[in-house]
Amino acid sequence: ISDGGIQEEISQGAGRLAGHLGLDNLIMFYDSNDIQLSTATDAVTSEDVAKKYEAWHWKVITIDGNDPDAIRTALTEAKAVTGQPTLIIGKTIMGKGARKADDSSYERNCATHGAPLGGDAYINTIKNLGGDPTNPF
């Protein structure tokens, strides 16, 4: 779920119910990059998401969401939880490693939402992430 999505009432209602029912087969990953579709999240909310979900009887695990090992460890921990759902809060950097055509950074840029990388931006990003643009996968 995204920063904007976690603010939506439907996700909050489902979150309250899942905690109340103790749905321990539910693991939700929250991509917390502090940016939503049109602005930084602190422009529209000051809530503590972790405390809110803990109050709803969720197990909350906060990690570096850009670290694959931290994600694996959190998922292993979450699968072992019984009697309550788990929220993994991955603190991430939106556009991590993405570079513009002029090689400046796309990181933490709200305008990056829905903006596909093409041309030189694509090539610069693959290079910046340690890949080969001629064989990126």
Task: Give the predicted meaning of each segment.
Residues 1-137:
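Glycine-rich ThDP/TPP pyrophosphate-binding loop and its adjacent helix/strand module
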